[in-house]
Structures are given as structure tokens and as C-alpha cells.
Amino acid sequence: MKLSTVIAVTFVLAIAVARAETDEVSAAAENSTRSWLSLTDKGQYEQSWTDAASLFQAAISTADWVRSLSAVRSPLGHLKSRELASATFARTLPGAPDGEYVVFHFSTSFENKASAIETVTVMKDEDNKWRVAGYYIK
């Protein structure tokens, strides 16, 4: 077998392994994100703070989080639909320590707001689990 063929086969296998690992990370991060969003959909705001990343918890108190999220989410009414629009991996984000992050954008529809964009940033936390580090809704 020619060396160029061996290199090409090795390269293709390396890409396949990297893609499988990326898909696995993406699935784990998305599952964690959707579980967390489910808490907010049910109005379990305090539990959503408890389940968030340590970076998130250090940035806002439980009481402030519950108050802020209640003010934003309650007027929207019940969730009607949520579709993943994009997922972007990052090692650095503005104002955050270097780490492993995935920024998800969801196209979401609520009872009282037909079209919203939810941005959820998850990070690999100290316990090596994907946890929400940021949430923004527009």
C-alpha cells in the first residue's frame, strides 16, 4: 500500500472519530440544555438556578434569578414549540474563563409571543457535566 493511501485512510478515520466525538458532546450538551429549559418551562426557576453552572450561580443569587426570570417568562405564557436553530462550540467567550462551551439558539414560540429566540450557553462545569452558564431570550 502506498504511503499516500495510508495517510489518506488515516486522515479519513481521524475525521470520522472527531466527528463522532463532536456529535457525542453536542448531544450531551443539548440534552442538558433541554432538561434545564424544561425546568424554566414549568416555572421551576429556583431549581433551574440550582442545576446551573457554578459560574452562573456566582454571578446571580437565587432570589435575583427567580425574580428576573419570573419577570421575563411569566408574561410569555406557556411554551408552544422550541426548535434548535444552531449550536456553536467555543473555548473562549467574552467575560468568561476559558473552557468548553456550546452556545445554543432556539426558535421558540410561546402562548403570548409567537416568535422568540432563546440563547442558552452551556459549559463543562467543575464536575465535568454540561450545565447552563447563561440564558437570554429575545
List the model feature ranges, each with a label.
Residues A87-K138:
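Exposed beta-sheet edge and beta->alpha loop/turn motif
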Residues E30-N31, E46-G99:
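Short solvent-exposed beta->alpha transition segments
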